[in-house]
Amino acid sequence: MIKKIFIAGSGGIGEAAALLLREWCEFETEIFLGDVSGENLRKAKELVLQNSGKTSKVETILMAKDDSNEAMNAAFENCDVLLDCSPGAQSPRMARYAVDFKMHYANLTEYVAETDEIITLAKDAETGFVLQTGLAPGFINVLAMSLYQKFQAQFGV
């Protein structure tokens, strides 16, 4: 089954996330890169396509700055996950889209006020919300779990 992932924000972190997801997922993905900058979208898509050996779809969505638009709504309707790589102040807005369009949600922000607002939104969500998944502790926890699972499989612990 193809997992469709919307990445909000196509700056350095968003483009890196897109490349990693496309190249290293153990399942098939379609990546939707969203940003308010057409130039960021162009650069991010180019980076992903040039540096990935996979052939899965990478689409770009020009996002509205303060609201949604038809392209965003169409992408949200089709996506399973919203990975929020947008500036922290945008996180509650992205989380609201995840609730409204029944997408799972993960964000990287460590902004306390925004995280508290997202926790309130997540209480009514029908999907999973994973907050503060940035480098530390987020990525470190994912990496540690992966290493643990490999160790467990190899040594039967």
Language-model features: where?
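Conserved N-terminal Rossmann-fold NAD(P)-binding element of oxidoreductases
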Residues: 5-11
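Rossmann-fold cofactor-recognition segment
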Residues: 51-67
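ADP-ribose/adenylate-binding Rossmann-like module
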Residues: 85-87, 97-115
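Rossmann-fold NAD(P)-binding glycine/threonine-rich loop
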Residues: 108-129
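Rossmann-like dinucleotide-binding core of oxidoreductases
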Residues: 127-157
